[in-house]
A protein has these predicted regions:
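Detector for methionine-enriched segments
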Residues: 1, 14, 35-38
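Bacterial N-terminal signal peptides
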Residues: 9-17
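Bacterial N-terminal signal peptides that target proteins for export
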Residues: 1-8
């Protein structure tokens, strides 16, 4: 009889211990569904990864600059398993100096790109975003396979990529 009570008690303890984890999993799933429901209608998904590091990268609200037809402003949709970040960024689509300008709390980053040229894994997102903003019909395509298209559009594919970091003043 004591063993039955012990097993029953152990079952109660286990269910009480698992309940927060189950609630957390449900809350996480609800959060993910809410984020998906909030996605803008003009969102174009550029990249996704599943699993523990679930991530969705998208672009929306792309607009040209009336003063400079080579500039585009847009919002990124960076959806993580437990967070949503929506920064506003810009790109320059010129054939001579294509670039992406992004920022965080510490700095502004000016990244000179080489559309259609060789690229590193660390610049893949830059190229995905640049192609989507400058040539929306190619949004979401793997930038590594766009060399012929880049040359067709007048890009040299032989530019030197670099990054300039402009530190922001400390608060």
């Amino acid at each position: 009889m004591q063993s039955i009570r012990w097993i029953f008690g152990l079952g109660l303890v286990m269910s009480a211990a698992c309940q927060p984890a189950l609630a957390e999993a449900l809350n996480r799933e609800q959060l993910l569904e809410q984020m998906k429901a909030m996605r803008p209608v003009d969102l174009v998904v550029l990249d996704q990864s599943d699993g523990a590091d679930e991530y969705t990268l998208g672009i929306f609200a792309v607009s040209g600059d009336p003063a400079d037809p080579e500039l585009r402003r847009f919002k990124l949709w960076q959806e993580y398993a437990d967070n949503l970040v929506i920064p506003t960024e810009s790109v320059n689509c010129s054939r001579e100096e294509p670039l992406r300008v992004t920022r965080d709390t510490e700095a502004i980053y000016v990244r000179k790109l080489n559309p259609g040229g060789s690229q590193r894994a660390s610049t893949r997102e830059d190229h995905l975003v640049w192609w989507a903003a400058c040539h929306p019909e190619l949004a979401g395509q793997d930038p590594a396979g766009l060399a012929d298209k880049a040359r067709e559009l007048g890009y040299s594919t032989e530019l030197i990529e670099s990054q300039e970091v402009l530190r922001l003043p400390a608060p």
